[in-house]
Curated annotation (Swiss-Prot):
The lineage of its organism: Bacteria, Pseudomonadati, Pseudomonadota, Gammaproteobacteria, Enterobacterales. The keyword Hydrolase applies. Its EC number is 3.1.1.88. Keywords: Hydrolase, Serine esterase. One of its GO terms (molecular function) is trans-permethrin hydrolase activity. It is an enzyme of class 3 (hydrolase). Inhibited by Hg(2+), Ag(+) and rho-chloromercuribenzoate. Catalyzes the hydrolysis of pyrethroids pesticides. Hydrolyzes cis-permethrin at approximately equal rate to trans-permethrin. Optimum pH is 7.0. This is Pyrethroid hydrolase. InterPro entries: PDDEXK_7. It catalyses: (-)-trans-permethrin + H2O = (3-phenoxyphenyl)methanol + (1S,3R)-3-(2,2-dichlorovinyl)-2,2-dimethylcyclopropanecarboxylate + H(+). It comes from Klebsiella sp.
C-alpha cells in the first residue's frame, strides 16, 4: 500500500488509487462540526424549554388575573369546622377538662402542698414572660380587688404552670401561694403549687369567644342564602388591587423574557439542518471524528482549517463551555435514559428544587454543580453536595442529595441554611425533604399524607428530635383528605399551617409549619413550581426564625427581608405610610410591587407573616382573603 499526502494522483507510482479523507485535519474538523451540532441542539432545546417555561408562567399569571373578582366563593365545610372549633373555645366544661388533664401532668413532678381556694382575674400581659396584670377575691360573691388597695397586682405563673393561663380570663383556683414579692408599687403573686383550676364562664375571653361564634354563625346563615358567595370588603379589594399590580408587573417581565428567548430560538433553529447535512457528508467520506488538535503545517497554514478552530473556540467562550466533557456526558446520559420511575421522580424533584432556588430565589450555585449532578446520574458518585449563595439576602444553602443523618437515616434531600441576621448573628436551620412517587391508592394505604409525614418526622426521626423541618414531595392531586385552609393549594398540599392529624399534640404544643406534604406534579402546568416555591419560601422566610412567644419591639424578622414572590432583595419598609402600629411592619418589593406584612398573634404573641392571598403559606380565614389564623394557637388574626 502506498500513501500519498500531496493530494494528487500524479505523485503516485502505482496505477490504481483510492482517495481517503480520513486525515487528522479532517478528523478534527468533523469533531468540531459534530460538537457544534450538539451545542446548537442543546441551545435549541434550552430555548424551547425557556419559551415553554415563560409561556407557562404567563398562562399561570393570566389565570390568577382572571380569578380576581369582586366576590369570593366561601368554603362551607371550613366555616362549619370553624364554628365547631369556636364552640369548644367557650365551652367551659371542655376547657376545664383540658385544664385538669394538663394540671395532672404538670403536678406529677411536683410535691403536693396544702392549697387554699381563691379567685383570680388575669388582664393583659405585662410584657414580661408568663406575667399578667391581675385582680383577686377570696370568694365568688366578693368584688374584684388589688392585693393592696393603693397598689397593683401581678400574677406570675412561672414556666411550669404557664400553659394553664390566658389573658382576660377569670379562674377559680386552689393553690399554695407564698408571701408575694414586691416590685415598686406592684405585688407579684406566684403559685408554688396548684391542686385545682377551672375557668369561669363570665371571663371576658370566654364571652369574646362566644361573641365570635355568634358573629360567624350569623354570617354563615346569611351566606347560605346567597349560595356561599361573598362580596369583597373595601380592605379586601385594596389587597386585590395590590396583587393585580404585582401580577401585571410579573406579566411584563415574563413577556419580555419570552420575546428575547424567541429571538434566540428563531436564530438557532434553522442552523440545525446545515450542520446535520455537513456532518452526514463528512461521515459519507469515511472520516472519523477525533478531538485531538492536529498541530500540522497543513492545519496551521490553511486559513479554512484555522477558521474552523478559531470559530469553535469563540463558540465555546460565548456559551461558557469550559469543559467539553460535560457536553459529552450529557449526550451519554440522554442515550442511557432513565426507566426507574421512583428514581426518575426523585431526580426530577432535585432539579425542581435547584430550579426554584436559582430562578425564583436567585441563589447562585457553585461552579462545578453540573459536573456533580452528571457524576451522580452516571453512577460515579452516590452522595452529592451543592452550595448555593445569595449574598444579597445574607443566606447560603448547602443542598445534599441522599446524605446520611447523624442517626443513620438517609432522606432524599437535606437543605442546610446559614443566615446572617441584620445584627450580625448567625442562624442555622435544616430542612429535610423526601420524594415519594406514590399513587393515590398507595398513599391511602400508607395512611394518607398524615401517615407518611408521621413515619418520616417521628418514626424515622428525620426531624432529629424535632430540630429539623420535614416535608414530603408527592405527585397526588387532592391528597389532603381533611382540608383545613381555604387557599387553592390546600387541596393538594399541607404546610403545617394548622393541626390536622390525630397523632399531633394539642395545637399550642405542636411544631407548627415544621412538617408537611407538598404536591409536586408536572401535570399541574407551572403550578407545581409554585408549590415548591411556597414551601421553600416559607422555610427561608419563616422557618429559620424563632417565631413563638414573640415579644420584640418590632414584628420584623431577624434575617434579611426578601420577596417570596420574585426573590428580590430590593424590598423597602413602608410601615409609616401603611400603619400606625409600632410593632407591625409592611414591606413592598421594588421589582414586582408585592406586599409583605409582619405582625403577631394577639393571643399567644407568635410572629406571623402575610404574603398576599396567593403566596401566604399560613391559613387564611374561611370568610376573608386578608385575615389569617395563628399556626400556634389557631386564633384568628
Amino acid at each position: 500500500m502506498e500513501i500519498c499526502t500531496k493530494g494528487s494522483r500524479k505523485h503516485l507510482t502505482s496505477r490504481a488509487s483510492e482517495p481517503s479523507y480520513n486525515v487528522p485535519e479532517n478528523q478534527y474538523v468533523l469533531y468540531v462540526v459534530s460538537s457544534t451540532l450538539s451545542i446548537v441542539k442543546q441551545l435549541v432545546k434550552v430555548a424551547e424549554s425557556k419559551k415553554s417555561r415563560f409561556s407557562g408562567a404567563i398562562e399561570k399569571l393570566n389565570e390568577r388575573l382572571d380569578s380576581l373578582k369582586d366576590y369570593r366563593i366561601i368554603n362551607r365545610d371550613l366555616v362549619v369546622k370553624d364554628l365547631e372549633r369556636l364552640k369548644k373555645r367557650f365551652d367551659t366544661e371542655v376547657i376545664n377538662a383540658e385544664l385538669s388533664e394538663q394540671l395532672a401532668k404538670i403536678n406529677v413532678n411536683l410535691s403536693r402542698s396544702y392549697s387554699e381556694k381563691g379567685y383570680l382575674r388575669l388582664e393583659k400581659a405585662t410584657g414580661s414572660e408568663n406575667e399578667w396584670w391581675a385582680k383577686i377575691k377570696p370568694s365568688q360573691n366578693d368584688d374584684w380587688q388589688q392585693f393592696e388597695p393603693d397598689g397593683y397586682t401581678i400574677f406570675s405563673s412561672r414556666d411550669h404552670y404557664a400553659s394553664l393561663f390566658k389573658s382576660y380570663s377569670d379562674y377559680e383556683i386552689e393553690a399554695k401561694i407564698p408571701l408575694p414579692l414586691r416590685r415598686g408599687k406592684a405585688v407579684v403573686l406566684y403559685p408554688e403549687y396548684i391542686s385545682r383550676i377551672c375557668v369561669l364562664p363570665e371571663s371576658r375571653s370566654i364571652q369574646r369567644e362566644q361573641e365570635n361564634f355568634t358573629k360567624l354563625r350569623d354570617k354563615g346563615i346569611a351566606l347560605s342564602k346567597k349560595d356561599w358567595q361573598a362580596k369583597l370588603t373595601t380592605d379586601e379589594l385594596a389587597e386585590q388591587e395590590k396583587e393585580r399590580a404585582t401580577i401585571n408587573k410579573r406579566l411584563g417581565y415574563f413577556a419580555t423574557e419570552h420575546e428575547k428567548v424567541g429571538i434566540v430560538h428563531k436564530a438557532l433553529e434553522p442552523k440545525l439542518k446545515p450542520f446535520q447535512q455537513i456532518e452526514k457528508e463528512w461521515r459519507q467520506c469515511k472520516v472519523k471524528s477525533k478531538s485531538t488538535f492536529p498541530n500540522s503545517m497543513t492545519f496551521v497554514q490553511n486559513p479554512a482549517y484555522q477558521a474552523v478552530h478559531s470559530g469553535f473556540k469563540k463558540l465555546k467562550e460565548q456559551i461558557g463551555l469550559a469543559d467539553e466533557d460535560i457536553l459529552l456526558s450529557l449526550e451519554k446520559i440522554e442515550a442511557i435514559g432513565l426507566v426507574n420511575m421512583p428514581l426518575l421522580y426523585e431526580r426530577w424533584c432535585l432539579l425542581q428544587i435547584i430550579k426554584v432556588l436559582t430562578q425564583a430565589f436567585r441563589y447562585q450555585p457553585e461552579d462545578n454543580w453540573k459536573r456533580k449532578l452528571i457524576a451522580n446520574i452516571q453512577g460515579n458518585e452516590e452522595q452529592i453536595s451543592i452550595q448555593f449563595f445569595n449574598p444579597s439576602v445574607s443566606r447560603a444553602i448547602t443542598l445534599q442529595y441522599e446524605p446520611f443523618l447523624a442517626n443513620g437515616k438517609r432522606p432524599d434531600f437535606v437543605l442546610d441554611v446559614e443566615a446572617i441576621t441584620k445584627s450580625g448573628n448567625q442562624i442555622s436551620k435544616r430542612l429535610v425533604v423526601d420524594a415519594k412517587y406514590y399513587s393515590a391508592a398507595y398513599l391511602k394505604q400508607r395512611g394518607g399524607i398524615g401517615g407518611v409525614i408521621h413515619e418520616l418526622y417521628n418514626g424515622k426521626d428525620y426531624s432529629e428530635c424535632q430540630e429539623n423541618s420535614v416535608f414530603v414531595l408527592h405527585p397526588v392531586l387532592d391528597a389532603v383528605e381533611k382540608v383545613v385552609s381555604p387557599q387553592e393549594w390546600a387541596k393538594d398540599s399541607y404546610l403545617g399551617e394548622l393541626s390536622m392529624f390525630d397523632w399531633e399534640p394539642a395545637h399550642h404544643q405542636r411544631q407548627a409549619t415544621n412538617y408537611g406534604a407538598v404536591c409536586a406534579n408536572p401535570m399541574k402546568s407551572q403550578r407545581y413550581l409554585d408549590e415548591i416555591q411556597r414551601m421553600l419560601g416559607m422555610f427561608l422566610q419563616y422557618g429559620i426564625e424563632d417565631n413563638t412567644s414573640f415579644r420584640g419591639a418590632s414584628d420584623d424578622t431577624h434575617a434579611v427581608n426578601f420577596c417570596v414572590s420574585c426573590g428580590s432583595e430590593k424590598v423597602v419598609d413602608v410601615t409609616k405610610s401603611m400603619s400606625s402600629n409600632n410593632q407591625k411592619r409592611w414591606y413592598r418589593c421594588n421589582e414586582c410591587t408585592h406586599f409583605t406584612v409582619y405582625t403577631h398573634c394577639g393571643t399567644c404573641n407568635t410572629r406571623l407573616i402575610k404574603n398576599g392571598e396567593y403566596w401566604t403559606y399560613l391559613s387564611l380565614m374561611p370568610m376573608s382573603s386578608i385575615n389569617i389564623k395563628c399556626p400556634n394557637c389557631e386564633s384568628p388574626v
